[in-house]
Swiss-Prot record:
Any single biological process term in GO: symbiont-mediated suppression of host cytoplasmic pattern recognition receptor signaling pathway via inhibition of IRF3 activity
Region (Disordered): 1-24, 38-320
Protein name as catalogued: Protein V
Domains as described in the record: The C-terminal zinc-binding domain is involved in binding to IFIH1/MDA5. This domain is also involved in viral pathogenesis.
Spans through the membrane: none
Family: Belongs to the paramyxoviruses V protein family.
Amino acid sequence: MDQDALISKEDSEVEREASGGRESLSDVIGFLDAVLSSEPTDIGGDRSWLHNTINTLQRPGSTHRAKGEGEGEVSTSSTQDNRSGEESRVSGGTSEPEAEAHARNVDKQNIHWATGRGASTDSVPQDLGNGRDSGILEDPPNEGGYPRSGAEDENREMAANPDKRGEDQAEGLPEEIRRSAPLPDEGEGRADNNGRGVESGSPHSARVTGVLVIPSPELEEAVLQRNKRRPANSGSRSLTPVVVPSTRSPPPDHDNSTRSPPRKPPTTQDEHTNPRNTPAVRIKDRRPPTGTRSAPDRPTDGYPTHPGPETDATKKGHRREHIIYERDGYIVNESWCNPVCSRIRVISRRELCVCKACPKICKLCRDDI
């Protein structure tokens, strides 16, 4: 019996603590609801109605408990406290109409300032929690004296006249043209860019369209004359090909270090006097033809000397030089062309002349082809 009484007593204490926690929570919720649903006022405004609400919520007897003899505590509903708080707030609000009007004007100015600064206007009415429409005001009064922009007025005009927007869409004009900002001045753009002079890239710039002109013949001629007066670059190469005279390589038995014919072995007087030791070869007469200078005798060292030039009657200035000597028992007749257009070179009998004019002019070179 005692154990059952102890258990019932503990249960009643637990219920009392739980009901007390719920009542305190309901009081806090009612106070927060009253504060959030009320309109804000300025710093110097009257807040007596708020104190009345707080006093009403904290008034003793707002939440009364009825305790029976054999029963636990019974708490009343918290809706009565909330209703009493709202009634007191309404009574306090009606008693101060001037404070509410002043607070409403301050709220309108704050909304208009937030609209001009680009901030979201939906957050302001939502935080106020006055239960009214949270959209933008139709035409807030310009009490603060803030200047209105042309784009804002135009948006209001377009919203008021939907037919005008339909006409623009029918004509094919985008809506951004009416709201686009004016093109910045060239001087202002350069000043804002710290003197770098970056021009605007808008296609509607008058400076850009002024450059696009139709070229005239006079303009083209002036450009050509200016290009001709420019000095030629010294580092550029000339496109004219340089003709390099081709030289023919000498025969294998010819020595490039000397301009003389091949060396002839020395001969003695006994070879000419003794017919038994000499071959039966007729020695050609060394006398030059008529009209030429006589060639000197062959020196004893075997090196021939250049005789005088042979003048050709067909062309003046072209001559042919030759020499005849004996080598290894054979008579060698070497000749070379000496035109004015090339250097003197010793050539053999069966070799083409280095100058291409010899076969046509020289009589001795015609058989070499």
